[in-house]
Regions:
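Beta-propeller domains with acidic blade repeats across secreted/periplasmic ectodomains
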Residues: 18-385
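Positively charged n-region of N-terminal signal peptides that target proteins for export
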Residues: 1-5
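Bacterial N-terminal signal peptides
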Residues: 6-14
Length: 385
């Protein structure tokens, strides 16, 4: 019996299931030739589709281009932006972009495919000049509200003499700090133009997204106060763990680091998902719900999450437990030609997944790729409970 068992096990091991690339076709998309000539200019930090099928793409040096996927032709829509990190298309002539100093609406008034008007939707937050004060987003809910998230500053660099907004030195030069409002927060812009500080406690919340029911999620990157990278269900007024942002919470007094950890932990809302550091993700990015209704594979309603350090896209399945969310994470597409720096994603009209790559001087790569399901069902773990 023993030799037969050994032979049987060897036979099973030799029939290992196919890699994910057997079920999804990966394609690298050529970028604008004028950007390809400039070092690091082809970092893609925002993607969305127009109703007419064009792709809107923002690049790290401040350009927004549109791509006609049928012809492969690129056209410059706008430039002069400051490190744009996301796009929401409103219609065939308008889009909203998050750039470092503001959330901006770009409008093509005459229909020639070039933005004529730049409108500030919100600049109701502080800027100290620290390099790490990113502005992530936006995303838009069914009621027309926009949400965006602000990164904290890094002790790896200081602040500028001229700042925007009030300066609070109580957290200055902590590992990651929020010396101006509302660093480490998610903010909401209402349809009538009000900016509302929505939730606090984030370190580097590089990625916002909704599930199919309209619940808002944000990822956060590992570091001080964030033992491993996480994904949170964002709700108004909640605090999610990074203490620096508490300086701008109404009624807060004193230096957050001087408060006992049990006191801070008592007001913290726990994450929905933890990404094991190194094994799963070091720098998770945008969560994107599979809204294709099964046309991208058997994962409808689950979330795909990018990762900067690896050539990996993760998959997250959530469930409701005692009024909150908890979930599992698993690698979805790992290696097999996928670049690192998977910073922004969007589903196209043909239900393929478009992926923008970036590095910002750290881990990652540059470029634009897309994944297309070939209709074969992969041998994968679908969900847990």
């Amino acid at each position: 019996m023993r030799p037969l068992a050994q032979i049987f096990l060897i036979g099973i091991s030799s029939l290992s299931y196919a890699g994910i690339e057997e079920y999804y076709e990966l394609e690298t998309v050529p970028l604008p030739t004028e950007l390809a000539k400039v070092a690091n200019a082809t970092q893609v930090d925002g993607l969305d589709f127009f109703p007419d099928g064009r792709l809107a793409t923002c690049f790290v040096d401040g350009q927004v281009y549109t791509l006609n996927p049928k012809t492969g032709n690129w056209k410059l829509f706008a430039d002069g932006l400051h490190e744009p990190l996301g796009i929401v298309v409103l219609n065939n002539r308008e889009m909203v972009v998050c750039q470092r100093p503001e959330v901006t609406k770009l409008r093509d008034n005459d229909g020639d495919g070039v933005a004529d008007e730049f409108e500030v939707l919100s600049d109701a937050f502080g800027i100290s000049g620290n390099y790490h004060e990113f502005n992530f987003g936006p995303v838009r809910d069914a009621e027309g509200n926009f949400y965006f998230s602000l990164g904290t500053a890094s002790s790896g660099a200081g602040v500028r003499y001229e700042k925007r907004g009030p300066f609070n030195p109580l957290s200055y030069m902590d590992r990651m700090y929020a010396c101006v409002p509302y660093r480490g927060w998610v903010l909401k812009i209402t349809p009538d133009g009000k900016t509302i500080p929505w939730a606090s406690g984030f370190r580097t919340p590089n990625g916002l997204g909704f599930d199919l029911e309209g619940h808002l999620f944000v990822t956060d990157n590992q570091g001080d106060w964030v033992g491993t990278s996480k994904m949170h269900h964002v709700q108004q007024g909640k605090f999610y763990g990074h203490a620096g942002s508490l300086l701008w919470r109404e009624g807060w007094e004193g230096r957050p680091l001087n408060r006992p950890v049990p006191e801070l932990d008592a007001i913290r809302t726990k994450a929905a998902v933890l990404f094991p550091h190194g094994a799963m993700a070091n720098s998770p990015t945008q969560p994107l719900v599979d809204s294709t209704g099964g046309k991208f594979g058997p994962f409808a309603g689950q979330l795909f999450v990018g990762e900067m350090n690896k050539g990996r896209i993760m998959r997250v399945a959530l469930e409701r437990v005692r009024g909150g969310f908890q979930g599992m994470c698993i690698p979805f597409y790992d290696g097999a030609g996928l670049k690192r720096g998977n910073n922004r994603m969007v589903f196209g009209p043909d239900h393929s997944l478009w992926i923008g790559h970036s590095n910002h001087g750290w881990a990652g790569e540059r470029g634009l790729q897309k994944l297309r399901w070939n209709k074969k069902v992969p041998f994968e773990l679908k969900s847990m409970s």
